Amino acid sequence: MRRAVVLLSGGLDSTTCLSVALAEGYEVYPLSFDYGQRNRKELESAKQVVKYFKLKEHKIVKIGNVGGSALTDMNIDVPDYKGLPTIPVTYVPARNIIFLSYAVGYAEVVDAEAIFIGVNAVDYSGYPDCRPEFIEAFQKAINLGTKSGVNGKPVKIITPLINLSKAEIIKLACENNAPLHLTTTCYRGGEKACGVCDSCVLRLKGFKEAGIVDTIEYMERT
């Protein structure tokens, strides 16, 4: 059976991505990171998603507090959604570079041919490491800088959600019976989702456009 490493944050997109890998017949190796994120519920959600799909392997890597972001520094406020065309304070420095680098090494160790990552360039917060050109550049680095790449069988980065709207992602998740009720999206990380940060607003908008009810609890529904 083909093997794939799946980057799993515990959020809607990564959980959908995991469901796609399973639907495509991969033996999946979920990979999560503890990087000092404000929303500590993310990792618990990731564990619940893994349990829901009855997966045996789930690697959680503790890399310490990356810092420099509202998602990792309690002294930086998470802003309400504004939809501005700028890189927001919730950007975590080089996050996907770090995650993908580790994922490539892990993929070579477990002999996986692919890495699934739920980056999206449509309904997203403007992070530079979610763009198609970043993924293309990183794929070139894999091709040139790994044993599998030099041997002509590089680990392939697969981004099934990159050109989908949030509504399309939600519909895909439902088709694959992904447990969206277990996912955590809010940047603020409270007991209930705030409903007004970038991530919450995009999620609520997606569910509304998909015509599907979002069953997680919110402080406020926009």
UniProtKB/Swiss-Prot annotation:
Its EC number is 6.3.4.20. GO terms for biological process: queuosine biosynthetic process. The keyword Ligase applies. CDD domains: QueC-like (cd01995). It catalyses: 7-carboxy-7-deazaguanine + NH4(+) + ATP = 7-cyano-7-deazaguanine + ADP + phosphate + H2O + H(+). InterPro entries: QueC, Rossmann-like_a/b/a_fold. Zn(2+) binds at C186, C194, C197, C200. This is 7-cyano-7-deazaguanine synthase. The gene is queC.
